Structures are given as structure tokens and as C-alpha cells.
């Protein structure tokens, strides 16, 4: 991975993330765990990793160390800063694409299996992917996150058509609505104060979405009904 990225530290972050996610999918499936339960766990893990990656990339690339040196009035060369920034971006790109792909796969599996908890969890994952893209600077990362969210949304719409074939028009209306919202977002250029307010709202919605993943995943495992029966 270091040879592919052209940077050893970036390769550690990207390759380590990919290896951890592959192991997270492979080991439970080989042990016979149901795919939808593995998807529920990996959905939470993948979204969580996406939230941690920007900070981890800065630490592993040495940017935080250089910032500390600069804060202490120690000399920092431009070459070292450029190398650290390049390492952070390369490692972040590979790791983010891997985590987004894992979250997309988890969302598709959840959307393709019956059950309200699974469908809600898939929708939350799609929303989390869209909200997470604000933290990633490169186009490849943003495109992967948006494509993943749209793919999961497509899976949910297909589930709708499969379960209720007589309401196919609802799927068409929902798809047109998504396209209309996307075009409006691309065309509208709000003033700076509206952007700042929008970021605050998005931060709160993202926090609520991520927090909701865990109790909904508990429902996928069927533990909510057991807890209700117990108490």
C-alpha cells in the first residue's frame, strides 16, 4: 500500500484501515454469523471510522507534531510541512474510500433484508455518509461518500418496490425528489451567515444520526423486544 500511495505513512493508514475492515467482514461471516448482523456491526464501525479518520491522518502524517513545534516557536521547514500534508491527504483518501465502501456494502445488505430495524439502519447509514462528506477535502472522497449514500437509497427504493409493487409510483416520486434536492443544492449559493448556520445544524443532525445507529442496531439483533419483555 505504501508503494501505491507513494508514501509509507499514508500506506500504513490506508492499508491498516482496509485490513481491519476486511477482517471485520470476513471473520464473523466465516464463523457463521448472519450477514445482516455483521452488516449492522460494520455499519457502525465504518461510520465511526469515517469520523475519526481526519484526526488520525493528521497524527500519523506528523502534522500535529509540526503544529506543536510551530506553537513552541521552533523552526519548521516548508518541505516538511508539504510532505506531511501530502501524506495526510494520501492516507486519508485511501482509508476514507475503504470505510465508505464498507458502509455502503453494509447499507445494501441491510436494505435488501426484510425488517423495519434493518431498513431504518440502512437509511441512517446513508444519511451519515452524506453528512460525513463535509469533513473530507478531496473530490474522490466526496464522490465515494455521495455515491455510497445514493446506492443505499437505491437499495431502499428497490426494497419498497419489491414489498409493495402496487406503489411503484411512490418510488418514482421519491427518486425525482432526491434529484430535485440535489440540483437545488448545487444551484443555490447561500450567503456566508446561512452557510455557518447550516454547518451548525448539520453538525447536530450528524451527531443525532450517529447516536441513533447503536440503538437501531440493537433492534436488528432483536434485543429491544427482549428488553421490553424483561422489564
Which role fits each region the language model picked out?
Residues 218-231:
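Juxtamembrane boundary at the C-terminal end of a transmembrane helix
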Residues 153-194:
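C-terminal hydrophobic structural anchor segments
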Residues 44-46, 174-181, 206-215:
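Small-residue-rich transmembrane alpha-helices that serve as helix-helix interface/gating elements
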Residues 9-166:
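Generic multipass alpha-helical transmembrane bundles of integral membrane proteins
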Amino acid at each position: 500500500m505504501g508503494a501505491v500511495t507513494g508514501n509509507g505513512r499514508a500506506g500504513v493508514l490506508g492499508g491498516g484501515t482496509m485490513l481491519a475492515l476486511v477482517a471485520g467482514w470476513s471473520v464473523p461471516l466465516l464463523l457463521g454469523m448472519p450477514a445482516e448482523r455483521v452488516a449492522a456491526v460494520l455499519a457502525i464501525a465504518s461510520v465511526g471510522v469515517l469520523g475519526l479518520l481526519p484526526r488520525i491522518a493528521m497524527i500519523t502524517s506528523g502534522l500535529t507534531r509540526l503544529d506543536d513545534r510551530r506553537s513552541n516557536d521552533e523552526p519548521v521547514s516548508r518541505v516538511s510541512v508539504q510532505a506531511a500534508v501530502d501524506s495526510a491527504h494520501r492516507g486519508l483518501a485511501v482509508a476514507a474510500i475503504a470505510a465508505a465502501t464498507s458502509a455502503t456494502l453494509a447499507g445494501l445488505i441491510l436494505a435488501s433484508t426484510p425488517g423495519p430495524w434493518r431498513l431504518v439502519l440502512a437509511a441512517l447509514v446513508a444519511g451519515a455518509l452524506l453528512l460525513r462528506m463535509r469533513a473530507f477535502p478531496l473530490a474522490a472522497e466526496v464522490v465515494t461518500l455521495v455515491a455510497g449514500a445514493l446506492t443505499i437509497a437505491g437499495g431502499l427504493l428497490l426494497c419498497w418496490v419489491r414489498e409493495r409493487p402496487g406503489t411503484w409510483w411512490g418510488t418514482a416520486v421519491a427518486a425525482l425528489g432526491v434529484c430535485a434536492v440535489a440540483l437545488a443544492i448545487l444551484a443555490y449559493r447561500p450567503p456566508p451567515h446561512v452557510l455557518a448556520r447550516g454547518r451548525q445544524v448539520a453538525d447536530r443532525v450528524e451527531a443525532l444520526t450517529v447516536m441513533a445507529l447503536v440503538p437501531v442496531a440493537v433492534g436488528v439483533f432483536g434485543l429491544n423486544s427482549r428488553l421490553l419483555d424483561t422489564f
